[in-house]
Amino acid sequence: SVCDLPESLIREFGISICPYYVCTDHGRFRDGEELRTDELLLHMAEGQTDYSQPPDVEDYERFFAEKLTEAQNVLHITMAKHVSQGYYNALEAAKSFENVTVLDSGHLSSSMGLMVLCASYMAERHFSKGEIVKNMKRLRRHISSAFIIDNTEMMCQAGKISRRVQIFCDALLLHPVIVLRKSRMVVGSMRTGDFAHMAKSYTKRVFLDSRNIDRRILFITYAGMDDQRLQYIRDLVQQYCPFERIYMQKASSAIASNCGPGSFGLLFMKKNEIVLNLSQASRPEETD
């Protein structure tokens, strides 16, 4: 559920999802099935404690067993292994099966989703499991995964950044840019100012090396933003680095519980040799 892909693409490629959990003061809920992002953000606005939790080993065992009734082999792509326990739980569950392979995406959210899309496309074209894994490990280095955080309180509560970093950011009105490097979440840089200023600064920096960017697909993945802010981000993208397809993707509740409202990421691939063709049916509407 944390790959943050639109339903149109999930349907097109027949992608199977093993949902994360979101734990609140009212219990534990399956991400996207029992708790939606908007509902979670209302909980957070009321000051309630929320955090994400990966599927248990038993959840993965049931998931893999079900999928193996439909296919001879299963390739499961997980969130970055140093960000979530999900990779290790899936790896443990895979020991019960001979034909389940678990792959660390090295990313999260729609950046991980890009790897899922490419792997699914290759599977549809009858690439072997070994070929897909080899290509995905290569692709991992060609994905740009960076989010800018509006308020660091949620990330601190989730243990993703230290209390010292949070205090520093609050005192100086700084917005950290969180990047994924070697499957680890690190603070790549800081942006200052109000939303308009920090969004423009972040966007300009992300697209600095535009000649090396694969412009086929961009995900603008966000949590708790109104239409005006989303349109402002789209306009910035058009100004600095237009893409063939731009998906405005609401982050899953599991992702939103970590980054908090007002955060967003510009997630895309750098130029690479992976072939990926999408149908017109899954093309995002221009007004999305």
Which functions belong to the PLM regions below?
Residues 1-54:
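N-terminal glycine-rich anion-binding loop in soluble enzyme alpha/beta folds
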Residues 2-24, 73, 83-101, 107-288:
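Mixed-charge interfacial surface used for oligomerization/domain docking
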Residues 53-62:
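Glycine-rich, highly charged phosphate/nucleotide-binding loops
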Residues 62-69:
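Short, well-structured alpha-helical segments in soluble
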Residues 80:
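Flexible, active-site-proximal loop/turn residues at the rims of small-molecule/cofactor binding pockets
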